[in-house]
Amino acid sequence: MKFLDEAKVYVRSGDGGPGCVSFRREKFIEFGGPNGGDGGRGGDVWIECVQGLNTLIDYRYRQHFKARKGEHGMGSNCHGAKGDDAVLQVPAGTQVFAEDGETLIADMTEVGQRVRLAKGGNGGFGNAYFTTSTNRAPRHANPGQEGQEMWLILRLKLIADAGLVGLPNAGKSTFLATVTAAKPKIADYPFTTLHPGLGVVRSDAREFVLADIPGLIEGAHEGVGLGDRFLAHVERCRVLLHLVEGTSEHAGKAYKLVRRELEAYGGGLADKPEIVALSKADALDPDTLKNQVARLKRAAGGKPLVLSAASGQGVQEALRAIQAQLDGEDAADETAEPAEPWHP
């Protein structure tokens, strides 16, 4: 399945059904009076977060979603039925923006979350509603209220507890495959990973979701190499595991390049808790390993972890460091106040 993390859709709620002009006609009742019912309300447009989806690919082939109109009112004071709703199903992590691409309407973070995007129009009143002491037989009814319509932009930012960041070919996919059941494409060339991937890590009777973010290059915050798309997925991660390839020419420079991209992108990426690790340690001789660790320590301002996903060296230590950071984040999240919901 192709990975699609942005889509533009058109939504329209249903018009309300028109009211009915009707009079009671019954034997021996000369002045039966008005009995026209009201029209039904138009259907709403909802967006719903569901299990089992991890891409917005469905919205590449269908962009228009319209709820049904309300039914007409009828005689004998029968009101019209409400129109059927239209429901957009999206994966967790989807954000809904107005057409300008900046106004956030909804942030779908949990399975089962449901937000109304467009409210259906009210049904029109039938002539029975307009009966007064001076007008006992009104001959008019209301048309239904029009529904709402708008263009929306859907953006998917994968929700993960921890994210793997680094330059291309830093060993992120190998690490993900080692610690989870995920099976990302792995090869010895840059940009093997073209789409973000998720896996569930189970360590010390605990579990968390780990995201493999495609490699970043210089200029990623400006969209070079689709970097701005990839960085958007990092926004959702609570902790970053920054892998620096041990076989690179200079581990310190490689680390600083990625840090510059995180800072330039903004959105608080540079402020996220970060665990720094030197990867592919099994491919280095002792002297080279010592030099690369020293360079990375100077650049990062702290001693990095040393790991090799291929041999298993340092992997459990890295997982425990991630879990410790997540435990600290959980304590901070308990004091956060919920955001005010959006209403159409």
UniProtKB/Swiss-Prot annotation:
Record SUPFAM superfamilies: Obg GTP-binding protein N-terminal domain, P-loop containing nucleoside triphosphate hydrolases
GO molecular function annotation: GTP binding; GTPase activity; magnesium ion binding
Taxonomy, superkingdom: Bacteria
Enzyme class, first EC level, given as a word: hydrolase
UniProt keyword Transcription regulation present: no
Any one biological process term the GO annotation gives: ribosome biogenesis
Location in the cell: Cytoplasm
Swiss-Prot/TrEMBL cofactor(s): Mg(2+)
Binding site residues for GTP: 166-173, 191-195, 212-215, 279-282, 308-310
Membership in a protein family: Belongs to the TRAFAC class OBG-HflX-like GTPase superfamily. OBG GTPase family.
Entry function: An essential GTPase which binds GTP, GDP and possibly (p)ppGpp with moderate affinity, with high nucleotide exchange rates and a fairly low GTP hydrolysis rate. Plays a role in control of the cell cycle, stress response, ribosome biogenesis and in those bacteria that undergo differentiation, in morphogenesis control.
PANTHER family assigned: DEVELOPMENTALLY REGULATED GTP-BINDING PROTEIN-RELATED (PTHR11702), MITOCHONDRIAL RIBOSOME-ASSOCIATED GTPASE 2 (PTHR11702:SF31)
Binding partners and assembly: Monomer.
Protein name, entry field: GTPase Obg
Taxon lineage: Bacteria, Pseudomonadati, Pseudomonadota, Alphaproteobacteria, Hyphomicrobiales
